């Protein structure tokens, strides 16, 4: 075969290969990327409340960012201040790597001193705008910890303002309003949590536990100390993660199962073990069921 013909055939085969590879990559990518911003009060709050959902979103190629409004510099019994804050930033970075999310930002506000001030509200507005969030998830404003309560309050205060051009004019306002959701909590007053969106996280429960494991200062030191269980923490790494799973990832409640039935078929509901729930806030855009399935594509796949 002449050399020019060989080169021609090689070029044809290479073009076919590249086209096939490109088409395969496009098939694996989400048809429309969803941008989700999770805002907690402390490094580790979001991991505990929504680590599984975040892992599922990231696994499907969607954009996920965690934010901690405080630096966590008070959450320990024998260390604190800048040394603890530095340690907790490193733990958050490692947790983000294990969950395979895009970013984990820890702000500078002191642990235990968060207030719903104009300064914090502006930071939250900026974060939502810069991330161009479709969904923003945060604490309910009725929680046991003052930082949780005020983190929830400041997200509420920012919910409308993110779309007002004259507020922080250097940060481009959102086009319309994102959907705002609440993390699940156990508090009943002034009103109980509503399981509007329930996500099965069985496929990524190991990844969630691994992310919690990254926060050593909290799950193996501070929180066991608070509950007088420090002597129960295993020394062995694998035993630690199993202990962590048993202690911090409870099986779903009847209320969660009832919420699950809206989004999953009977077999899936019966087989599900671990879930995460979210309540739709009255602030922000009010999504239809179809919109929720677009924002949480794992629900549309059922």
List each language-model region with its residue ranges:
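N-terminal secretory signal peptides that target proteins for export/translocation
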Residues: 1-6
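Bacterial N-terminal signal peptides
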Residues: 7-21
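Active-site rim/loop-helix segments in enzyme catalytic domains that contact anionic ligands
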Residues: 26-131, 153, 161
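C-terminal accessory domains and tails appended to enzymatic cores
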Residues: 32, 164, 168-169, 174-176, ...
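A short helix->loop->beta-strand "cap" motif at the edges of active sites that frequently abuts
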Residues: 62, 175-179
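Short acidic, glycine/proline-rich loop/turn micro-motifs
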Residues: 76-79, 191-195
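Conserved acidic residues
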Residues: 102, 134, 178
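Active-site adenylate/phosphate-handling loop in enzymes that bind or generate adenylated species
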Residues: 127-171
């Amino acid at each position: 075969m002449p050399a020019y013909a060989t080169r021609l055939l090689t070029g044809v085969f290479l073009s076919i290969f590249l086209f096939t590879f490109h088409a395969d990559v496009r098939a694996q990518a989400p048809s429309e990327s969803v941008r989700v911003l999770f805002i907690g009060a402390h490094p580790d709050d979001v991991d505990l409340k929504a680590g599984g959902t975040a892992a599922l979103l990231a696994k499907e190629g969607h954009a996920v960012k965690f934010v901690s409004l405080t630096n966590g510099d008070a959450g320990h019994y024998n260390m604190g201040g800048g040394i603890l804050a530095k340690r907790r930033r490193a733990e958050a970075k490692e947790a983000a790597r294990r969950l395979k999310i895009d970013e984990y930002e820890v702000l500078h506000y002191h642990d235990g001193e968060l207030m719903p001030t104009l300064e914090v509200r502006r930071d939250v507005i900026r974060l939502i705008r810069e991330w161009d969030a479709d969904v923003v998830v945060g604490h309910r404003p009725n929680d046991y910890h003052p930082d949780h309560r005020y983190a929830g309050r400041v997200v509420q205060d920012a919910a409308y303002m993110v779309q007002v051009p004259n507020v922080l004019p250097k940060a481009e306002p959102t086009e319309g309003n994102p959907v705002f959701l609440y993390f699940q909590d156990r508090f009943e007053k002034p009103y109980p949590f509503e399981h509007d969106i329930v996500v099965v996280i069985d496929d990524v429960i190991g990844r969630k536990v691994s992310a919690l494991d990254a926060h050593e200062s909290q799950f193996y030191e501070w929180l066991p100390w608070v509950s007088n269980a420090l002597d129960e923490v295993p020394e062995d790494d694998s035993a630690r993660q199993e202990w962590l799973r048993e202690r911090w990832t409870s099986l779903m409640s009847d209320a969660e199962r009832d919420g699950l039935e809206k989004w999953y078929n009977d077999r899936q509901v019966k087989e599900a073990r671990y879930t995460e729930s979210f309540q739709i806030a009255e602030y922000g855009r009010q999504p239809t069921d179809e919109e929720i399935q677009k924002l949480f594509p794992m629900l549309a796949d059922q």
